[in-house]
């Protein structure tokens, strides 16, 4: 009996996959919806009776899982890079002109979908996991939710290992329909798609019409020579690729490429989905490897971002905001205006110099844009209805302390300023720092305004059950807040050091400190008590300059900062982080390096990432201050320049031991 059920399940899965391909890839469905649904229900029934036969590639998983998703962070197996971008066609043409195609012109052009970036991992042809791009090194695990998108094959029909990039999006039509029923509407379809994808219950996600385009291989278990062949393979495997992708070869001209870009730009508003630009890629994979990568982006691809669409609005008021560093930033409150797919009600004015340069004041009519289709900005005054220009107050709007000008910006220097305090707490809880879930800016502001907390330390001593009498705070939410606070105590010392807010101390500098045996509070504290010795010691670390060295020394001689560390120590925080680095790897710490050529079995981003993890500092170009150049096969002009500058040359064999 069980063998018959197992066979029927296998037959149903095969048939449903066939219908999925006909409907979503070929656009030629052979059965009506009710027939499809009937077979899905039968498969669900059988899998419920015999759960041992339910596999990860089952089509029933596309309708949601009974399990709840916790969106844990998972490390990407390869760095997930961004794209370089330009905003005008002259710069785009210049980028194309610089590429040495060796009389074999090959470029692909496709719309840049304005959605949520996703990375799909297939193991032996089965979808193993799906991660958001995150910060490029770590992404959120949204596998259960991605499985609900019927355009994502759970099984490829081939036992291959693939890492693919795609964009999850929602159509303009569905965006408008869904937004009507939401208590808090989203400003654009990208945010809605991202919000849906991050819903905790995958059963809810299955009810939303998410779409996906797959557009790139990050690490393929298949051998391709060109992007053309790779895209065709994606189609055959059942993935949805953008039908507007076009390939230009040696028979084409740059003019034809630019004409196609102009055509896409002209028609962008007629597409069923939002786009914010066009992406150009070199099609030849061998040439891609020769062109290489920077730490941020591949050199073989370029995004042409559309000029920000603009609108006109009236400045109703100008408010002054205070950041965690005390920096004063003026912001214009304007009449609501719809620009590039989003409503804008405020826009940064940067600083006093910028306001003066455009002669802006309250009451003026201004041109507003979203730079890069993201950042709201006041570009210029269109109609001047005021007298003179707005002047940033000479006192902090929060604590009334006289502000001090440093460079182009004004700063509040009061360490007890309420605005500075609340912004520091927000920074402490933010994703890049302690990543304390549930503590949104709104929640933190509420706690601060009610005088429940005045610093980040209060988060660990406050009785959150006092919030039960306030609207929006129930047992479940409060328990989640408490659990998040407790979980943060287990974060590594590097996160605490970053979160505590030492001026200009970032992740890279912290890594350099740790790799030089300054990996605990006690070591840093002892060092900094002798200011002169500490200054000389820190300057010996390649990558640390005078300014950041002084900031570190000042911080570890500041009684307020020291007391914070002591309190965190008493709360059970880790005050030391082990760094496993042998004598051989110490040779790389602080060394500046660059790479050229290709490396057998390793992509350039992986080489860079592994050397950086050993303490080396990646540079994009060869200069006199470079410590060594890593040379692979088919090295480019960087090798010649390095030889002229007497920069040390290291082969792939020289560094291979560092990569394992």
UniProtKB/Swiss-Prot annotation:
Where, by residue number, does Zn(2+) bind? 396, 399, 412, 417
Q: Where is the active site?
A: 112 (n6-amp-lysine intermediate)
One GO MF annotation is: metal ion binding
Biological process terms in GO annotation: DNA repair; DNA replication
Q: What does this protein do?
A: DNA ligase that catalyzes the formation of phosphodiester linkages between 5'-phosphoryl and 3'-hydroxyl groups in double-stranded DNA using NAD as a coenzyme and as the energy source for the reaction. It is essential for DNA replication and repair of damaged DNA.
Enzyme Commission number: 6.5.1.2
**Family annotation (SUPFAM superfamilies):** BRCT domain (SSF52113), DNA ligase/mRNA capping enzyme, catalytic domain (SSF56091), Nucleic acid-binding proteins (SSF50249), RuvA domain 2-like (SSF47781)
Per its record, how is this protein called by name? DNA ligase
Question: Does the record carry Membrane as a key word?
Answer: no
Query: Does the record bear Nucleotide-binding in its keywords?
Result: no
Cite the PROSITE patterns for this sequence.
BRCT
Q: Which residues form the signal peptide?
A: none
Species of the source: Borreliella afzelii (strain PKo)
């Amino acid at each position: 009996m069980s063998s018959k059920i197992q066979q029927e399940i296998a037959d149903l899965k095969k048939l449903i996959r066939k219908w999925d391909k006909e409907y979503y890839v070929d656009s030629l469905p052979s059965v009506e919806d009710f027939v499809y649904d009937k077979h899905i229900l039968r498969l669900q029934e059988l899998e419920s009776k015999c759960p041992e036969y339910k596999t990860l590639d089952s089509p029933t998983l596309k309708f949601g899982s009974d399990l709840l998703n916790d969106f844990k962070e998972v490390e990407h197996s390869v760095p997930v890079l961004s794209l370089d971008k330009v905003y005008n066609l002259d710069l785009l043409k210049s980028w194309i002109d610089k590429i040495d195609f060796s009389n074999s012109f090959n470029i692909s052009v496709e719309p840049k979908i304005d959605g949520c970036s996703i990375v799909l991992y297939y193991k032996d042809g089965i979808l193993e996991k799906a991660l958001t791009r995150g910060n490029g090194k770590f992404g959120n695990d949204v596998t259960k939710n991605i499985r609900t998108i019927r355009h994502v094959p759970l099984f490829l029909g081939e036992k291959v290992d693939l890492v693919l990039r795609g964009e999850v999006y929602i159509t303009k039509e569905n965006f408008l329909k869904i937004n009507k029923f939401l208590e808090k509407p989203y400003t654009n379809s990208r945010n809605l798609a991202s919000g849906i994808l991050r819903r905790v219950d995958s059963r809810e996600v299955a009810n939303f019409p998410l779409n996906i385009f797959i557009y790139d291989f990050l690490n393929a278990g298949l051998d391709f020579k060109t992007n053309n062949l790779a895209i065709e393979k994606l189609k055959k495997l059942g993935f949805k690729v953008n039908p507007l992708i076009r390939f230009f070869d040696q028979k084409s001209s740059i003019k034809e490429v630019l004409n196609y870009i102009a055509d896409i730009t002209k028609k962008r508003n007629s597409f069923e989905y939002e786009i914010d630009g066009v992406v150009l890629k070199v099609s030849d994979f061998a040439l891609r490897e020769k062109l290489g990568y920077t730490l941020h982006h591949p050199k073989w691809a370029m995004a042409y971002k559309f000029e920000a669409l603009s609108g006109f609005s009236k400045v109703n008021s100008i408010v002054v905001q205070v950041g965690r560093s005390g920096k004063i930033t003026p912001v214009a409150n304007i009449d609501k205006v719809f620009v590039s797919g989003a409503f804008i009600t405020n826009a940064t004015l940067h600083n006093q110099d910028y306001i003066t340069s455009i002669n802006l004041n309250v009451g003026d009519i201004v041109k507003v844009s979203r730079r890069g289709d993201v950042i709201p900005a006041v570009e210029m005054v269109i109609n001047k209805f005021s007298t003179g220009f707005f002047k940033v107050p000479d006192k902090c709007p929060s604590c009334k302390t006289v502000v001090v000008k440093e460079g182009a910006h004004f700063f509040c220097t009061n360490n007890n300023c309420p605005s500075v305090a609340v912004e520091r707490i927000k920074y402490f809880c933010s994703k890049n720092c302690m990543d304390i879930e549930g503590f949104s800016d709104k929640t933190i502001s509420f706690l601060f305004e009610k005088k429940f907390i005045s610093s980040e330390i209060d988060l660990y001593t406050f009785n959150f059950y006092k919030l039960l009498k306030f609207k929006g705070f129930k047992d479940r939410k409060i328990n989640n807040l408490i659990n998040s606070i407790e979980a943060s105590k287990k974060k590594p010392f590097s996160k605490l050091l970053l979160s505590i807010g030492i001026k200009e101390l970032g992740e890279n500098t912290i890594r350099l400190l740790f790799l030089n045996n300054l990996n605990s509070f006690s070591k840093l504290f002892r060092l900094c008590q002798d200011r002169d010795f500490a200054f000389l010691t820190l300057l010996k670390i390649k990558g640390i300059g005078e300014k950041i060295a002084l900031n570190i020394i000042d911080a570890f001689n500041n009684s307020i900062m020291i007391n914070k560390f002591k309190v965190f120590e008493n709360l059970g925080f880790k005050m030391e982080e082990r760094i496993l680095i042998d004598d051989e790897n110490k040779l790389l710490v602080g060394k500046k390096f660059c790479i050229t050529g290709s490396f057998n079995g390793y992509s350039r981003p992986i080489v860079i990432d592994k050397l950086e993890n050993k303490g080396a500092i990646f540079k994009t170009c060869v200069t006199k201050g470079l410590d060594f150049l890593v040379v692979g096969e088919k090295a480019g002009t960087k090798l010649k320049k390095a030889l002229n500058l007497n920069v040390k040359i290291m082969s792939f064999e020289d560094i291979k031991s560092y990569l394992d």
